[in-house]
């Protein structure tokens, strides 16, 4: 059973799980892969429990005003808020939104653009579940971002 145990204080997060992590509003975020490989682009990210479970479980912590950019998955994605206050927005333009707090859950369907941002006043944490053993692929929309020049990265 020890290979099926994950203690949060022993998890090793990635501070650059996706290329957008170099941009303002995305820099102060940590991504944890707890069960399964998830969809992070960081090939060095530690996967705590590697055996197949029929889903992938991860976590995200972020400082205020930090989160993800608009993206979609080929699998369903469920967010379970553990602490803090998070804004979730979705749709091709990201104009639909809601605020979630500790204990709240939102399920995002496949192939729908979605994003999140910590709108609280301290570092906050949520757990993320992706359906299936194969977490699918991620599609990122950078249309809402002002990308920096090479000198700024």
Q: What residue ranges belong to the model's regions?
A:
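A short, N-terminal "cap"/entry segment at the start of jelly-roll beta-barrel domains
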Residues: 1-54
């Amino acid at each position: 059973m020890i290979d099926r145990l994950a203690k949060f204080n022993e998890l090793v997060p990635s501070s650059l799980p996706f290329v957008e992590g170099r941009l303002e509003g995305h820099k102060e975020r940590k991504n944890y892969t707890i069960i399964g490989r998830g969809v992070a682009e960081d090939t060095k990210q530690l996967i705590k429990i590697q055996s197949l479970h029929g889903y992938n479980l991860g976590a995200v912590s972020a400082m205020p005003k930090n989160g993800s950019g608009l993206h979609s998955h080929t699998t369903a994605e469920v967010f379970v808020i553990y602490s803090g206050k998070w804004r979730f927005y979705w749709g091709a333009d990201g104009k639909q939104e809601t605020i979630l707090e500790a204990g709240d859950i939102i399920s995002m369907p496949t192939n729908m653009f979605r994003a999140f941002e910590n709108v609280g006043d301290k570092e906050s944490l949520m757990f993320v579940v992706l359906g299936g053993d194969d977490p699918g692929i991620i599609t990122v929309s950078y249309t809402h971002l002002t990308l920096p020049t090479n000198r700024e990265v």
